[in-house]
Amino acid sequence: MADIKTAVAKTKNARISPFKVRQVLALIRGKSAERAQVILKFSDKRAAGIILKVLNSAMANAEHKYGMDMDKLYVHEAFADQGPVMKRFRPVSMGRAHPYVHKLTHITVKLCERQQEAK
């Protein structure tokens, strides 16, 4: 397993909840890179657009940095980590304010080449 090349792309502080991103990442995990692109393009989730940019970046990294075969690429790992939160206040009645947070997310996509099994 040590000789397997991996292409990685990350985005930090994406302004979307990690829960919402993880729902979309579950759809593409383990799929071929081209199939994952199609899934993300036709998804109506807002997170899909952000993840598509990260996936395209990982595919470009695989081709230019490592010379990997684009037809053999698949999504080896895809995960979202909790980023920092931005605390905000919403004004409510009687001069009060209720706190809420904007959650930020770190998204990572790792691509590998599929190995042909010897028979």
Residue spans for each PLM region:
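Short, charged/polar surface micro-motifs in flexible loops or helix N-caps
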Residues: D81-V85
